[in-house]
Amino acid sequence: MESKDWVAGISKSDAGRYSRQLLVDDFGVSGQKNLKNTAVLIVGAGGLGCPVATYLGAAGVGTLGIVDYDRISLDNLHRQVAYKEDQVGQSKSQGLADNVKLQNSGVTTVVHNVSLDSSNAMEIFKNYDIVCDCTDNVATRYLINDVCVLLNIPLVSGSALRWDGQLSVYHYGPDCPCYRCLFPSPPDPSSVTNCNEGGVLGPIVGTIGSMQALEVMKIAAKLSTTLAGKLLLFDGREGKSRTIRLRKRDPKCAVCGDEPSITAPIDYMLFCGAGAHDKIENLKLLEPSVRVNVHEYQEIRSAARKQFLLDTRPPVEFEIAHLPEAIDITLNECRSLQAEELSSRLGVDSQTSDVYVICHRGNDSQRAVKLLKEKLGSIHFRDIIGGYEEWALKINDEFPLY
């Protein structure tokens, strides 16, 4: 066997596979080696997690852990592009890991098909060098942040909603804030909108997820030009992005401050007043006497007399599908319009006794009933339990679910 007459900084197979990124200034061989020696944890195998995992796997990350207990559904596919139609019903974390291995068999994948919570997060996170928050709920964001601080792990956090996305790196460097530094208290749960309610375009999560992968590569390569201490805001509608500087680490922060009060994971559902998931919770804001189920409303609308049905959904949802008798008056309009204008829009008069109110899933319709009772007290407003989703499930399975 002939002796080598050259000095190689990287193996022949890696040089061939990763040649285009090896040629990039400030990344090169050292960056590739560092990336190969890095273990990255992705929390959330959805719209953000798919591009993060795909690009990091293709780039040659050493170990890729994926946390997600959910299963692939048809309404995921427009934005969660790692999955295919024949995978509907299968595990997201396993499906995404399989996709990474198909593209790059040299990557070690670890599947955590569990619901992340205070009891298991420390044990899972301790084996990773960088964490990517690709989730869509506030409680999990605080949990991920706190555990990253407690274990001294840099956190790459992304989010996307409708046309917009944002991205930052937390807890990376002495002056870099953590998420809790900026948001010491969680928002009111009723003010939080996720993509299940507000929607999102696939290219938005694709853009933000790709940029999360880029931040991971920069951190792994030990570059100083990360988004630590900065927040990138992306406006997909206008095709614009801007970066703002965040305030420095708060010495009084409850988890990363000089005298932290949080030294272990807490009860984040209690802290945030909301569940650690992106599912829509069914609210109960009204007495049963002012609510009807979809079967009862079906009987009512079968009667000969005219029905008054108020649909509180935004115009984009009303356009997807609605019952023919529905009158579109949004929840915001129920708040802002005066009684006279509401009466005019509804077409009601002094002889009208009942108006039924419907929305997507039965939450906004309850809020609307409470508002309308204050403005038009002579009319009996009744909420339809479960909204159009319940209608589609129990009355007409041809009604478009979304």
From Swiss-Prot:
Binding-site list for Zn(2+): 178, 181, 253, 256
User: Entry's CDD domains?
Assistant: ThiF_MoeB_HesA_family
Q: Does the keyword Transferase apply?
A: yes
Q: Which reaction does it catalyse?
A: [molybdopterin-synthase sulfur-carrier protein]-C-terminal Gly-Gly + ATP + H(+) = [molybdopterin-synthase sulfur-carrier protein]-C-terminal Gly-Gly-AMP + diphosphate; [molybdopterin-synthase sulfur-carrier protein]-C-terminal Gly-Gly-AMP + S-sulfanyl-L-cysteinyl-[cysteine desulfurase] + AH2 = [molybdopterin-synthase sulfur-carrier protein]-C-terminal-Gly-aminoethanethioate + L-cysteinyl-[cysteine desulfurase] + A + AMP + 2 H(+)
Q: Which residues bind ATP?
A: 47, 68, 75-79, 92, 136-137
Cofactor binding note of this UniProt entry: Binds 1 zinc ion per subunit.
User: Which GO biological process categories is it annotated with?
Assistant: Mo-molybdopterin cofactor biosynthetic process; protein urmylation; tRNA wobble position uridine thiolation
Group of enzyme by EC: transferase
Q: Give the GO cellular component terms, alphabetically.
A: cytoplasm; cytosol
Cite the GO molecular-function annotations of the record.
ATP binding; metal ion binding; molybdopterin-synthase adenylyltransferase activity; molybdopterin-synthase sulfurtransferase activity; nucleotidyltransferase activity; thiosulfate-cyanide sulfurtransferase activity; URM1 activating enzyme activity
> Per the UniProt record, which EC number(s) apply here?
2.7.7.80, 2.8.1.11
Q: Which SUPFAM superfamilies match?
A: Activating enzymes of the ubiquitin-like proteins (SSF69572)
User: Which pathway, metabolic or otherwise, does it act in?
Assistant: tRNA modification; 5-methoxycarbonylmethyl-2-thiouridine-tRNA biosynthesis; Cofactor biosynthesis; molybdopterin biosynthesis
The UniProt entry lists the main location of this chain as cytoplasm
Q: Which UniProt keywords apply?
A: ATP-binding, Cytoplasm, Metal-binding, Molybdenum cofactor biosynthesis, Multifunctional enzyme, Nucleotide-binding, Nucleotidyltransferase, Transferase, tRNA processing, Zinc
Residue positions of the active site: 195, 359
The UniProt record lists the Rhodanese domain at 303-400
Q: In UniProt terms, what function does this protein have?
A: Plays a central role in 2-thiolation of mcm(5)S(2)U at tRNA wobble positions of cytosolic tRNA(Lys), tRNA(Glu) and tRNA(Gln). Also essential during biosynthesis of the molybdenum cofactor. Acts by mediating the C-terminal thiocarboxylation of sulfur carriers URM1 and MOCS2A. Its N-terminus first activates URM1 and MOCS2A as acyl-adenylates (-COAMP), then the persulfide sulfur on the catalytic cysteine is transferred to URM1 and MOCS2A to form thiocarboxylation (-COSH) of their C-terminus.
Q: Which family does it belong to?
A: In the N-terminal section; belongs to the HesA/MoeB/ThiF family. UBA4 subfamily.
Q: What is this protein called?
A: Adenylyltransferase and sulfurtransferase MOCS3
